[in-house]
Amino acid sequence: MSASILDYKFFSKCLGIDESEIYAIRKASPFNLDNNPIKTFDGFNLSHKTIKRDAPKTVDAIKSVLDKHKNEKGIIHTVSGTCRDYLIDNVNNERLIGHDVSNRAEQLEKFKKSDKPLVLISPSMNEGVDLPGDLCRFQIIYKIPYPDLADKQIRLRANADEDWYDYKTALSLIQTYGRGMRFKDDYCITYCIDSRIPEFIASNSFLPDWFKNLIV
């Protein structure tokens, strides 16, 4: 059982399983999706070509989100370590708690146990992390979580199958979205800074309609 297979036919293809061996059962989500809307921003194109130009513009937007949720815990998904470091240095807010490869688990535990409204900032908390209830009342997705084409294996697979790259990006995006909504009556608002995200969501064939309808 999984909440993030998206397209079971393509999923089986990625696993090398014949489609005839798959029987898909779909169930409606028990979550109230009105409790986890997606809000987007205009004017911040964080593509490889324009991120240096537009990243400085995002700082005030992130500060405004942090101020709006000044008494709540949240998380900023930066996708890359470079973006994490940039935001820590330029947002310059004592609530931010980051990590490196060596202390990821330790910092996550520190974040969970703290009574302060800390904000976890990370490139790698988009899956396998459970932040129910007051542990995450808001989250910021800084940029589209495209797989890193600097990785040779990813580049080879993307060149061989463009759909695979779109699928992996959609999968990462929907998994990231799910970090703050962990049980039926939970609630969490998601902010997408990268202005390319709404178009990506609207045009990606792997993302379900219920997800596309979350943008407010």
Task: List PLM regions with ranges.
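Conserved helicase motor "Helicase C" RecA-like lobe of SF1/SF2 P-loop NTPases
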Residues: G74-A105
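Interdomain hinge/linker at the junction between the two RecA-like core domains of SF2 helicases
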Residues: S4-V65, N213-V216
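Conserved RecA-like ASCE P-loop NTPase motor core of nucleic-acid helicases/translocases
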Residues: M1-A3, E72-S80, Y191-I193
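Short, low-complexity, polybasic intrinsically disordered segments
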Residues: P198-V216
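Short, solvent-exposed amphipathic alpha-helical segments in soluble enzyme
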Residues: C14-D18, V91-N93, C136-R137, F206-K212
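Phosphate- and divalent-cation-binding pockets in alpha/beta enzyme and binding domains
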Residues: K9-F10, C83-L87, E127-D130, I201
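Conserved RecA-like P-loop NTPase helicase motor core
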Residues: D42-R53, V101-F200
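Gly/Ser/Thr-rich loops at beta-strand to alpha-helix junctions
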Residues: S4-D7, P30, S80-C83, N126-E127
